[in-house]
Regions:
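Sec/Tat signal peptide C-region and signal peptidase I cleavage site
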Residues: 16-22
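Central antiparallel beta-sheet cores of small beta-barrel/beta-sandwich binding domains
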Residues: 23-107, 113-137
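General helical structural elements
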Residues: 6-7, 91
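Bacterial N-terminal signal peptides
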Residues: 7-15
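Positively charged n-region of N-terminal signal peptides that target proteins for export
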Residues: 1-4
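Low-complexity, intrinsically disordered or weakly predicted helical/coil tracts enriched
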Residues: 15-16, 128
Length: 137
């Protein structure tokens, strides 16, 4: 009976170990990402990411060095890969777009993808509606 109990506990532990290691998203997404948002290629620079919390605050710039360069602010959840940020006008902090997506599990090339919603047509906000995006770093 003792051997059967130990064998059962070992099997449950082994199965649980695989589940616990199933996550694997990057702990940090700070850096320069090559992105395409609705056929517009450019860069997303994530400059900062907070160090604590299930979801962590991020800041940066989208399309830096271009006429449509804007600051971004949002969050990244390294335990689920979820990502969301808003693209803002620097002059008045108004939101132009809301980007929502997921980061792939950690790999040689990290990838992200999702949709963005354009909520303003001001200064690079584009046409109102929802569009796709993808990125790699």
């Amino acid at each position: 009976m003792k051997k059967l109990l130990l064998a059962t506990l070992f099997a449950v532990s082994a199965a649980s170990a695989n589940v616990a290691m199933a996550d694997g998203w990057p702990l940090s997404i700070v850096g320069n990402w090559s992105i395409i948002g609705n056929q517009h290629a450019g860069s997303l620079v994530i400059a900062t990411q907070s160090a604590v919390g299930h979801c962590r605050r991020i800041t940066g710039t989208i399309y830096p060095g271009t006429a449509v360069s804007h600051p971004i602010e949002g969050f990244y959840c390294p335990f689920s890969g979820r990502l969301q940020f808003v693209r803002k006008l620097p002059a008045n902090n108004d939101t132009l777009q809301v980007w929502t997506g997921n980061v792939s599990q950690d790999g040689v090339v990290d990838r992200m993808g999702g949709t963005f919603t354009s909520v303003s047509t001001a200064l690079g906000g584009g046409s109102l509606g929802e569009y796709n995006f993808q990125g790699a770093k």
